């Protein structure tokens, strides 16, 4: 909780205001960097908080892309995401499952709004890093540990491959 603060946003698609949990960058202490440049911080996985999702219309994007949406893209989101979107519950402390659902929604939004390949690739990379964090923090005593690790490892590999292909085509 010491790492988290509430930030208020106005959705660029539906123009409604909402709050989102974000990481206080001054509180997160870097402890290592993986070979693929994923930063690992003590006490918090910042990747779980890098997607901003409007709980009203379903517009979702990585923080760096959230406000940069053109009117034709917003129209595509309203027509293809908002119509079928079901509100999700919001928690201050985001679980890995919640974070991955937000990443999936963010990737779907990127595809629908015809975002650049680099945006889709970066979303896949950040999602892969979140999956890796999930694997590192999953309860080893859980009954489904081996099955869950296999599932998550396959997801991470697929996301890394998608990110690589996206960056190459960008």
Description of each model-found segment:
Residues 78-87, 94-107, 114-148:
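Amphipathic alpha-helical repeat scaffolds of TPR domains
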Residues 1-79:
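N-terminal cysteine/histidine-rich coordination modules
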């Amino acid at each position: 909780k010491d790492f988290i603060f509430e930030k208020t946003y106005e959705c660029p698609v539906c123009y409604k205001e909402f709050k989102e949990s974000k990481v206080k960058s001054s509180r997160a202490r870097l402890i290592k960097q993986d070979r693929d440049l994923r930063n690992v911080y003590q006490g918090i996985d910042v990747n779980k908080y890098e997607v901003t999702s409007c709980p009203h219309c379903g517009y979702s994007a990585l923080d760096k892309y959230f406000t940069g949406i053109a009117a034709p893209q917003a129209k595509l989101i309203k027509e293809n995401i908002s119509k079928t979107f079901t509100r999700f519950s919001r928690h201050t402390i985001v679980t890995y499952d919640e974070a991955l659902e937000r990443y999936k929604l963010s990737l779907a939004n990127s595809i629908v709004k015809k975002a650049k390949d680099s945006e889709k690739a970066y979303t896949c990379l950040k999602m892969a890093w979140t999956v890796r964090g999930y694997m590192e923090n999953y309860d080893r005593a859980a009954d489904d540990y081996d099955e869950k690790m296999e599932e998550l490892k396959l997801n991470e590999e697929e996301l890394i491959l998608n990110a690589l292909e996206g960056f190459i085509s960008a």
